[in-house]
Amino acid sequence: MDFESVLAGWDGEHAVVRHDAESGAWMFVCVHSTVRGPAGGGTRMRVYPAPADGLADAMRLSAAMTWKMAGAGMPRGGGKAVLAVPQLPAGEPRRRLLRRYGELVASLGGSYRTAGDMNISPEDLDVVAETCPWVYGTTSGGGNSGRGTARGCLHAIRATVKHLFGSPELAGRSILVQGAGAVGGVLAGELADAGARVLVSDVDEARAAATGCETVAPERVVETEVDVYSPCAVGGTLDAESIPRLACRAIAGCANNQLAEPEDADRLRERGILYAPDYVVSAGGIIQLIGLEDEGWDEAHLEERLAGIGETLRTLFAEADAESITPAEAADRLVRRRLAEARPS
């Protein structure tokens, strides 16, 4: 499929497509919305079946960032970048590619501000920052956003448990964390410290075992009986095939795009499974980076704002119950309202 076909019907503001001859990589920067402020979103580096798949990924994720920023009440719009590479580079070729990518982002004049994502570390962002001033999450900046993402997810799980059981206390509650990476691994430790019975699953069994928690084979995740299932790895795990097999009471995780399609929110409601909308739950990372690097917050104020994720969910759950809608629809209403309020009349 060609790039024009992929872009057809996209409701974003602009997309930048550049081929990097030296590395063979394609650079895609998608700015979905700047209505609430400059677009923010991470950069991922990945090998795709075809370059057009990388563009489609950037488009989809940039739209999700618009909703995440608005849902978190942050003064930013949504964007995303993808470096679609023939193979993951290392050493000096990687460094040169990242510097050229920084020049591309800098040429956009601050309309898009980037951070880390898949296969992009704080050290990589240091290199990007050599040629671009619009970089979050360097080693000298707000740091790895996984800390804020995990902490925000913890507050989200507390709010979810309170709605289900009447108390936010996690002691004795069973929680399955899917993904033991930079976010899931930290989250598992926080949950264990709070007294929860924590189960962890990861495609890398050694990484799951390193958390010190009870482990679950990846193929058994959906059917494992727990109070809360917390997807913190790949998206799209909730669909027409998996939802009927779920054995959890609620879902609250920070993986992006957990629902394979919007109708899956209705499927969860029909099963009596409480769903915390993913873009609300996962906003802690952007809150951390923007708050510490742009807004000048201290750690105490950052923690207050991360706790606000739980407050937002409590409001959404109450609205969903009162109006007999899904929490996902309640969250979408909130975002649409905030975007409409920001648009010039």
Q: Model regions: which residues?
A:
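Flexible, glycine/charged-enriched surface loops at secondary-structure junctions
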Residues: 69-74, 111-116, 165-174, 320-332
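N-terminal ligand-binding/catalytic initiation module
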Residues: 1-140
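Glycine-rich phosphate/diphosphate-binding loop of Rossmann-like nucleotide-binding domains
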Residues: 144-230
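Rossmann-like adenosine-cofactor binding region
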Residues: 203-281
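Adenosine-phosphate binding glycine-rich loop
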Residues: 161, 249-345
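Hydrophobic beta-strand scaffold residues
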Residues: 112, 198, 215, 274-275, ...
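Conserved dinucleotide-binding and phosphotransfer motif residues
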Residues: 108, 194, 271
